[in-house]
Amino acid sequence: MSNLFKITLLFLLITLGKPAATFAQTNAATKYKCMIQMTNYMGEGAYIVISLIDAKGAYEKTLYVMGPDKKWYNSLKEWNKFRAKKPANISAITGASVTGGDRSVNTIEIENSKMNAGYKLRFESAVEDKTYNVKDVEIPLTTEGLASKSEGTGYIRYVRFSPN
């Protein structure tokens, strides 16, 4: 009787475990190294936020924040509006700000289902007492987009991605 119970339990685990495994595969994510090279601007460290933008141009998710002091997040105006409407714990995806001429390498995680599906990565940048760049860099979230070097228009000189 004990063996019959064990076999039944094993059968149920295998049968019911398959949908969960399938669900986990559809929500799988890939980690990428993101290297940001800054221009040689003069001034304080730049606060930069990397956001996932949907096909309609709306913010969907914060992927990384460079700049640890929350009191300056309001300088990233468009992202801060999104954050106010849809608060999320970003402590695990927050790092140091980046100064002029420096580079930063961080790891970001992107859901595989978002690749080649009309999404973009937006890099917003702000420096104290200087211009705010809502779209310093915007990269199509495609295989080709992540494979190439993307030039910035503000404090960011360029961004490159590589598989982690």
Explain the meaning of each model-derived region.
Residues 1-28:
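Bacterial Sec-dependent N-terminal signal peptides
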Residues 55-118:
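Structured domain cores in non-transmembrane regions
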